[in-house]
């Protein structure tokens, strides 16, 4: 049922203190409205939770971004455009900057606010896992004064929070302690832009001496609230990376979440995606180690276009991908680089994908199935392929024969070689995957092969940055 505008009262005080006083006079009666991106949706459905609306849009006390030596303090009224364009947010809190760029379209980013996203309490909100990973603190204000609350403790259930009826979020505080961490984020949705997440991940980690010194992994759309994977983090911290640890981390992460079946996805799919994303993050973290990526990126950012494209070509094998990546420089950090790689790859043509596929050897062989792209450093690509297929190369003769037979059947059916991210997978696992994928139709299999190539490219980029 639609609502009647005459049933609502709307006022716009000129100061934060006036808003706080109003909320204190009638706790729970007034609904603060910032950018109002959800107002018309709720209004049209007759689901606005209050009849009295008070505007907090454009209040100067809520729109600042203050930077000190120890922390950055983001006003709750700052928009996603403010966040994605802010220099310190981009350089030191890239997970949040990337999430801001994912949130809706440009119009939504110009109006939507970080504080509003937090209070709206959607478990699918893109920015909230980043706040969990960075261990944000909220500053809450009311007529009773000010209090700080860890963001991790803010959500108590689906669409439920610890915000009192007379309180507002004034600011979000992030400590500046993660500049040495690798940042990893990914959003899985029905399309590349303006889509509600099926799963989103924000993770940071730091290696020291081959051991995971620190790790924080947060997820959205997999539980009634945004979720930190505490058990998975405890499993990984202090450990060196082994295939068995990655396998156990995949299992632990999938068991730690509480996904549901809904209009966007299924619980089973979400669990599988979470396992894959956690494994990918760990592999990239391991490949990067303790390297200072800024030096590698700074050098590559300054190369001529052709030289830059040729240098990263072995990571993927597609000239289209390599040249588009080189044309997007400079990249501020590895998170931005990897995000651009994913987006560039997804927007290539099927012909570009096939070019990348042809640069790989068949599973169980050492030479590319067809000639590698021109200008590719084939020796580097060959070395990486051997590393990726190490377990297959060590398998028995019977299994290699079965793999060769399945490869032939696959190529006859789909017209290109079988592509799988083989890192950490045993030969029997790969053969089982190959046989399962033989049941796909051509379009489904092409997209699955492209997804596997995306994962391979990410891992190889980590190795390239480590050279």
Summary of predicted features, one role per range:
Residues 1-293:
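C-terminal structural segment of proteins
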Residues 275-280, 284, 343, 416, ...:
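Short, residue-level hotspots on alpha-helical faces of the histone-fold
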Residues 76, 224-228, 300-304, 315-318, ...:
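Short acidic alpha-helix initiation/capping motifs at coil-to-helix transition points
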Residues 294-315, 320-406, 456-467:
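Aromatic-anchored, charged helix-turn/loop surface patch used as a conserved interaction hotspot
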Residues 16, 93, 243-246, 305, ...:
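Residues at or immediately preceding the N-termini of alpha-helices
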Residues 392-467:
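C-terminal non-catalytic interaction appendages of large macromolecular assemblies
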Residues 89, 105, 318, 330-331, ...:
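Alpha-helix boundary/capping and short turn/kink residues
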């Amino acid at each position: 049922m639609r609502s009647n505008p005459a049933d609502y009262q709307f006022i716009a005080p000129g100061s934060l203190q006036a808003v706080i006083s109003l909320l204190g006079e009638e706790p729970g009666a007034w609904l603060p409205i910032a950018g109002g991106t959800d107002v018309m949706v709720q209004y049209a459905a007759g689901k606005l939770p209050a009849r009295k609306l008070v505007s907090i849009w454009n209040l100067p006390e809520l729109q600042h971004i203050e930077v000190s030596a120890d922390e950055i303090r983001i006003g709750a009224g700052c928009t996603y455009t403010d966040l994605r364009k802010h220099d310190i947010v981009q350089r030191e809190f890239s997970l949040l900057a990337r999430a801001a760029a994912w949130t809706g379209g440009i119009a939504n980013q110009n109006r939507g606010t970080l504080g509003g996203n937090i209070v709206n309490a959607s478990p699918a909100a893109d920015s909230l896992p980043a706040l969990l990973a960075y261990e944000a603190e909220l500053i809450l204000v009311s007529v009773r004064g000010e209090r700080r609350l860890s963001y991790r403790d803010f959500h108590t259930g689906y669409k439920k929070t610890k915000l009192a009826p007379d309180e507002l979020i004034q600011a979000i505080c992030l400590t500046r302690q993660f500049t040495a961490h690798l940042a990893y984020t990914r959003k899985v949705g029905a399309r590349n832009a303006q889509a509600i997440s099926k799963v989103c991940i924000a993770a940071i980690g730091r290696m020291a001496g081959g051991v995971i010194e620190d790790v924080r992994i947060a997820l959205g759309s997999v539980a009634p609230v945004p979720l930190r994977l505490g058990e998975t983090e405890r499993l990984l911290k202090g450990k060196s990376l082994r295939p068995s640890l990655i396998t156990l981390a995949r299992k632990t992460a999938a068991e730690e979440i509480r996904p549901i079946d809904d209009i966007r996805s299924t619980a089973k799919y979400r669990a599988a995606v979470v396992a894959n994303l956690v494994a990918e993050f760990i592999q990239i973290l391991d490949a990067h180690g303790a390297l200072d990526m800024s030096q590698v990126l700074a050098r590559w950012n300054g190369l001529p276009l052709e030289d830059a494209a040729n240098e990263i070509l072995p990571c993927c094998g597609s000239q289209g991908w390599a040249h588009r990546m080189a044309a997007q420089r400079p990249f501020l950090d590895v998170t931005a680089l990897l995000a651009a790689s994913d987006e560039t790859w997804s927007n290539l043509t099927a012909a570009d994908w096939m070019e990348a596929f042809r640069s790989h050897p068949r599973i169980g062989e050492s030479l590319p199935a067809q000639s590698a792209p021109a200008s590719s450093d084939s020796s580097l690509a060959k070395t990486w392929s051997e590393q990726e297929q190490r377990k297959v190369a060590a398998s028995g003769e019977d299994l290699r024969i079965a793999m060769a037979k399945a490869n032939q059947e696959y190529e006859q059916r789909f017209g290109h070689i079988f592509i799988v991210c083989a890192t950490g997978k045993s030969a029997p696992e790969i053969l089982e995957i190959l046989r399962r994928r033989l049941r796909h139709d051509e379009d489904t299999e092409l997209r699955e092969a492209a997804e596997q190539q995306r994962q391979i490219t990410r891992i190889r980029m980590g190795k390239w940055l480590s050279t």
